Amino acid sequence: MRLQLIAIGTKMPDWVQTGFSDYLKRFPKDLPFDLTEIAAGKRGKNADIARILDKEGEQMLAAVAKGNRIVTLDIPGARWETPRLAQQLERWKQDGRDVSFLIGGPEGLAPACKAGAEQSWSLSPLTLPHPLVRVLVAESLYRAWSITTNHPYHRE
């Protein structure tokens, strides 16, 4: 199984790059984790946000390999505590399909992305900045992996 993070935005602050890269390199070779960045649509004063979201959504879905499980990151999604996420990760491994996690831009995800998802995951009831979500997802998935392998990273 491979994990893929598909996120809107290509120019992230250094702290995002550093934090995400730190967790990315920790993943074992048998659980590769890749990042696919989608350029954000230009948002000006009179921008058609619905059209921008639709275009971003098309690009995100085009980046998902056929057969992948799609999991959106969205406030109304399921709130998984860490042990539950570890169980979820094990189920995904047993399913054998790759998993693509979708993180929207400033206005969230396109309706087509939400409609195409098999699952939706909420990190918090708070609205989080989309760059921060990248780091939180990477850390959460790494922690879940550490639980499934009895790695000492996670402590109760």
From Swiss-Prot:
Its EC number is 2.1.1.177. It catalyses: pseudouridine(1915) in 23S rRNA + S-adenosyl-L-methionine = N(3)-methylpseudouridine(1915) in 23S rRNA + S-adenosyl-L-homocysteine + H(+). It comes from the Bacteria. It holds the Pfam family SPOUT_MTase. GO terms for molecular function: rRNA (pseudouridine-N3-)-methyltransferase activity. It is found in: Cytoplasm. Keywords: Cytoplasm, Methyltransferase, rRNA processing, S-adenosyl-L-methionine, Transferase. S-adenosyl-L-methionine binds at L73, G104, L123, S124, P125, L126, T127, L128. InterPro entries: Alpha/beta_knot_MTases, RlmH-like, tRNA_m1G_MTases_N. It is an enzyme of class 2 (transferase). SUPFAM superfamilies: alpha/beta knot (SSF75217). Homodimer. Belongs to the RNA methyltransferase RlmH family. Specifically methylates the pseudouridine at position 1915 (m3Psi1915) in 23S rRNA. This is Ribosomal RNA large subunit methyltransferase H. It comes from Sodalis glossinidius (strain morsitans).
